[in-house]
Amino acid sequence: MSPEMKAMYKDGDRARKCSYCSEKGHTKRKCEKRTKDIAEYAAENKKYRKAYLDAMVQHGLSIGSLVTPMGARGEKDLGDISPEYIGMVTHIEWKDIQYRRRSNRPIQAKRLGEQENNWNNDMWLGSPPINSKDYESWGRCQVLSRRNDILSHVPADWLDGLSGAEEFF
């Protein structure tokens, strides 16, 4: 071993390199750039989640809401919708509602009508039209029965913007 390497091992600094920023002298856990990036992301994610929750409240979308995929099969109004295309919201994957993942489908609904294929009873709803003036549609879905209890389902630390963000950092 070279004298330089011996000196690094002796001082405990043995070429420590951050896996986040690739700089030497610290680890990912103590990386200042990562800490700053996480704080910036949390601030943006907090704003996004607040707008998302406001849209859910405005739509009356919550666990137990009845929804239908309007437009997915060419329906023009509620009279055209057959019962097998009506579902009830059963689950919201809160940690998947992320500023950097706007195109995901975190809201799960179960179809209510009889199905030919029992394996396909789930409907996954996309993100709300947060900045849209059209609050009658939710992605390509419409809320048929409005509920006002969504706030009781929100996890305690969800609005801080950090939950679920660890996968990005």
Locate predicted features.
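Intrinsically disordered, low-complexity linkers and tails
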Residues: M1-K24, R29-F169
